[in-house]
Amino acid sequence: MKKALIVGLNNYPGCALEWCNNDAIAMKELIESNGDGSPNFDVVPIIDNCSKNDLTLAIGKLFADDADIALLYFSGHGADLDGGYLCTTDFSKSDYGVKMTDVLEMANKSRCKNKVIILDCCFAAKMGESILLNNNSVLGEGVTIIAASQSWQTSEEKRSIQHGIFTELLIQGLKGGAADIGGNITPASLYSFVDQSLGAWQQRPVFKTNISQFLPL
């Protein structure tokens, strides 16, 4: 079983984004079925608005069972305080949303075989940078993170493509640009495609993993 939580948040009070909902809708449509029309991921979408409580519950549910692949995709604002946040649309100056460390803890504890976290937000590579836990690797077995930008960088949207730059390349990769000779796409091949496609662009993606064998997306 493959399951995914696809999140695209635009409606931030005072700092709205334009294309995160487009990002999420496109990602949902791409991964919920294979090229031949057969089912692929069981997708739960969250579009435009989401509270901290609702996002926390949804992420917990995503990682709660023993799926072959559990994929979290987030497009929205990120904050670089306290190890990083996935900002929710009910954010405040005292609470920006869901802590990246909390997301990673849920993924690390999950019994799912492959846990893939894809973040198209500013400071995305903050995910996985926290202090080592109990002298073990920050990334638990089976966890992979693909981040749109370095931990000190912003992630850009582009009006001409009506997507985030990072997600636009993810879309191209999932449409076949990142496929191997057998037509399979893995998190590693997807990252490689995005990284090479960005060329000299200032925003640099980041790939972190602790896995012995990838399952195709």
Identify the meaning behind each predicted range.
Residues M1-L217:
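Cysteine endopeptidase catalytic domains of the caspase/legumain-like
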